[in-house]
């Protein structure tokens, strides 16, 4: 594997050396006509006279500059397309033998286009690489219709959705989730599930965040950008969806756009159900003998959110204000109904087998409310500005509840237990950001952030007493806890562009205080530390529409409260969990090198990445009592990931767009903890083939297939699996009404198999989703204004929707 990566790196550098720099032939830079800000996310297309397809395509750098080189002599027209802006088309210009064309500043005019006005569209590229992030376009992914951000990300390179519906990126679930640059109400996969796909413009995956961003998150930040471009007047959208799994979602968004102000109101009612069949086989080896379990049965989960949101914004010539609020009830539930066959072989005696039905009900939910206030003032039109924001989130009536019971096959209760964890939470975040342009193409950014998280609660447990026939509280299990985390951060970033070269260097300092107070003796902890986190991003534009990007970021993953909770809980009668108050943060060095090549409407991208993590946190499983296992979190040692991510987008015909994504990396974990773990390594890989077919002006078909390779931990491994999806979208009534039918895992090939092997524990787990999983989504958009008729004339190669 290491030799393969070395050869791939050598080939990549050989390509770069072959593409020796030459002078530009065409250049310019893009800015927003209203606020003068540089635009770094647009498609710049070069058309030769009498041709309807572009001969070259590129995207601007972080300062808005774009370049074309190796362009033959001739007469050309430049076109720039970006969602929410008027299409720009230059006047024809001629390139002669020694001529160069400098188009200078191109002002992009914000487009007053409603949600339904998709006549001005062609195919959108699903993935675009930028200096410090990759951008996933949402609306062109049919499998996301009626779903959430999870469904949109499922077709992204290096992203996996495991058997429990949880998202991992390059093997890790350690990422932060933001919505429009603000922290999500929830965390991880649950946060992604709360955002309806129909309201998403695009998703930014920031794998090596700059010093401006939070340092939390092992593999970076996922920032969801919601739709904001509307016609003047009243606009809106409504989405309804349902599935054969009884998943149901309804969401709406209404917007009133005036000359200088805007208000919006939105809401959703979502129940995202997952259903599967579980098989479990385990054997624990103890001094007195062995305990074997053979279990199977259905499992069902639900991630739910019932909420309303609203906001108001005011845009003056040099100053903007924004107020947003959201409130509702959300969380997740889980139910399992497993048949357990327990066989005990003790003291050399004959095996004794008992059969039970284990029913488990779990819920973790809260009432939440959050609000934010933001203001930004521009001192001039050259990027000199200051911005401030304040965010608050309240979580009340928070309850974590679990009920377990064992019954014999006649339905008589043999044992039972339940626990309750009542909590109160709040979060504060304040930001102050200042930007000072040093020159036309360089700037200095600096800022301060205050973050505070507070949680207070208590925990109690009840066990079934067969003599009294009631559940009785266990005083020895009662625990009160208090947790507080406060972080003060400062940062400074310098960035600039020099001809073909882009650079951004940053430094962030953070002082962190964590306090854990518990009624359990010797379990309270107080920690304080100051740390420095650097970041570096470099970009170089090569001839023939090629670009190379280099990035480095130093990050951390701080333990969540449930990692540290020092009391015993039970997932079911055979699975216990306890926290570790002494767990330490992880520290991650993340490096990437990305190469991009555009040829016409096609593109190729390759990313080499390396990640080194110190004090890796992993869930460990050990024998506890009898057949019961005990899970806990621990710093197991170090791990390394080195790999290559490749994306090839081709547009072979007018009606077919295909994307091939592949990810292969060598993973190695060095175990430094004597808990049955071991050193382990594996070659992990996953591949995705996505196909979009235009079957008519209003009909589109999507076919995709995914293959996910095996992976390892310090205690075991997971097997490979594959699945295929198909979806069709039909638009009606001048594209105001859209219906999408999606069929996931068509061949019922998806399955999760995990195998744990230690000196005293052997455990095999198999999870297979229920079949079939078919989702129907109906969307309606409305607007009080029509699209500008001049834009239809500018639209070349109209396909279906989106902007290329």
Locate predicted features:
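N-terminal periplasmic accessory domains that precede
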Residues: 105-106, 149-151, 167, 190-191, ...
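Outer membrane beta-barrel strand-and-loop segments of large Gram-negative receptors
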Residues: 296, 418, 427-431, 472-479, ...
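Short, acidic, small-residue-rich periplasmic hinge/interaction motif at the N-terminus
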Residues: 31, 43-47, 81-83, 100-142, ...
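Short, acidic Ser/Thr/Gly-rich low-complexity loop/linker segments typical of extracellular
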Residues: 49-65
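Surface-exposed extracellular loop regions of Gram-negative outer-membrane beta-barrel proteins
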Residues: 224-237, 277, 281, 294, 513-515, 544-590, 610-631, 744-759, ...
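Transmembrane beta-barrel wall of Gram-negative outer-membrane proteins
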Residues: 25, 242, 246-274, 289-336, ...
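Short acidic/polar hinge/loop motifs at secondary-structure boundaries
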Residues: 149, 155, 182-208
């Amino acid at each position: 594997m290491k030799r393969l990566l070395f050869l791939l790196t050598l080939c990549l550098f050989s390509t770069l050396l072959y593409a020796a720099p030459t002078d530009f032939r065409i250049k310019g830079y893009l800015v927003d006509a209203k606020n003068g800000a540089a635009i770094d996310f647009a498609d710049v297309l070069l058309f030769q006279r009498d041709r309807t397809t572009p001969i070259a395509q590129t995207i601007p750098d972080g300062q808005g500059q774009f370049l074309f080189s190796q362009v033959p002599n001739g007469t050309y027209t430049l076109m720039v397309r970006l969602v929410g802006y008027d299409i720009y088309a230059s006047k024809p210009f001629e390139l002669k033998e020694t001529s160069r064309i400098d188009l200078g500043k191109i002002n992009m005019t914000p487009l007053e286009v409603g949600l339904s006005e998709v006549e001005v569209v062609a195919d959108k590229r699903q993935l675009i690489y930028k200096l410090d992030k990759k951008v996933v376009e949402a609306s062109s992914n049919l499998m996301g219709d009626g779903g959430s951000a999870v469904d949109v990300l499922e077709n992204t390179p290096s992203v996996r959705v495991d058997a429990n519906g949880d998202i991992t990126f390059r093997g890790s679930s350690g990422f932060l989730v933001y919505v429009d640059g603000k922290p999500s109400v929830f965390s991880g996969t649950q946060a992604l599930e709360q955002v309806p796909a129909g309201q998403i413009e695009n998703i930014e995956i920031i794998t090596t965040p700059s010093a401006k961003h939070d340092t939390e998150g092992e593999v970076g930040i996922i920032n969801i950008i919601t739709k904001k471009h509307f016609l003047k007047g009243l606009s809106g959208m409504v989405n309804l969806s349902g599935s054969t799994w009884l998943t149901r979602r309804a969401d709406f968004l209404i917007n009133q756009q005036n000359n200088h102000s805007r208000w919006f109101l939105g809401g959703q009612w979502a129940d995202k159900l997952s259903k599967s069949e579980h098989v479990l086989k385990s054997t624990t080896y103890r001094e007195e003998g062995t305990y074997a379990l053979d279990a199977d049965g259905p499992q069902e989960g639900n991630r739910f959110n019932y909420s309303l949101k609203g906001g108001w914004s005011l845009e003056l010539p040099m100053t903007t204000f924004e107020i947003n609020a959201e409130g509702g009830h959300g969380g997740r539930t889980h139910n399992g109904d497993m048949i357990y066959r327990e066989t005990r072989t003790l003291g050399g005696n004959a095996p004794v087998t008992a059969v039970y039905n284990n029913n488990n009900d779990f819920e973790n939910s809260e009432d939440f409310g959050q609000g934010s206030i933001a203001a930004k003032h521009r001192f001039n039109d050259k990027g000199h500005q200051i911005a401030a924001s304040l965010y608050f989130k309240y979580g009340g009536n928070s309850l974590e509840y679990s009920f377990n019971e064992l019954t014999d096959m006649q339905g008589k209760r043999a044992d039972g237990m339940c626990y309750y964890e009542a909590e109160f939470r709040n979060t504060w975040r304040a930001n102050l950001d200042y930007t000072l342009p040093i020159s036309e193409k360089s700037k200095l950014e600096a800022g301060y952030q205050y973050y505070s998280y507070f949680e207070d609660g208590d925990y109690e447990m009840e066990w079934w007493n067969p003599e009294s026939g009631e559940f009785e509280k266990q005083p020895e299990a009662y625990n009160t806890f208090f947790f507080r985390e406060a972080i003060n951060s400062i940062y400074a970033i310098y960035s600039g562009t020099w001809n073909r070269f882009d650079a951004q260097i940053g430094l962030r300092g953070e002082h962190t205080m964590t306090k854990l107070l518990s009624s359990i003796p010797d379990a309270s902890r107080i920690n304080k530390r100051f740390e420095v986190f650097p970041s570096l991003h470099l970009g170089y534009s090569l001839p023939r529409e090629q670009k190379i990007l280099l990035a480095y970021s130093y990050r951390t993953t701080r333990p969540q409260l449930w990692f540290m909770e020092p009391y015993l809980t039970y997932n079911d009668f055979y699975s216990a969990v306890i926290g570790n108050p002494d767990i330490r943060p992880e520290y991650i060095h993340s490096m990437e090198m990305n190469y991009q090549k555009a040829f016409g409407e096609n593109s190729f991208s390759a990313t080499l990445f390396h990640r080194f993590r110190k004090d890796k946190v992993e869930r460990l499983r050990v024998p506890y009592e009898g057949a019961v296992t005990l899970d806990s979190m621990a710093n197991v040692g170090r791990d390394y990931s080195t790999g290559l991510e490749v994306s090839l987008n081709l547009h072979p015909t007018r009606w077919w767009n295909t994307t091939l994504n592949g990810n292969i990396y060598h993973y190695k974990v060095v175990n430094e903890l004597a808990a049955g773990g071991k050193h382990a390594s594996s070659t992990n890989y996953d591949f995705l083939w996505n196909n979009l077919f235009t079957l008519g002006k209003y009909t589109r078909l999507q076919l995709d297939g995914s293959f996910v390779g095996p992976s390892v931990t310090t205690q075991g491994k997971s097997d490979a699996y594959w699945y295929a999806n198909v979806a069709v979208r039909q638009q009606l009534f001048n594209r105001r009404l859209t219906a999408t039918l999606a069929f996931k895992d068509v061949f019922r090939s998806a399955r999760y198999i995990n195998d744990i092997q230690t000196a005293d524990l052997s455990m095999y787990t198999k999870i297979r989703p229920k079949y079939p999983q078919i989702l129907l989504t109906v969307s309606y958009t409305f607007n009080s204004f029509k699209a500008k008729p001049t834009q239809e004339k500018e639209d070349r190669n109209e396909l279906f929707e989106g902007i290329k």
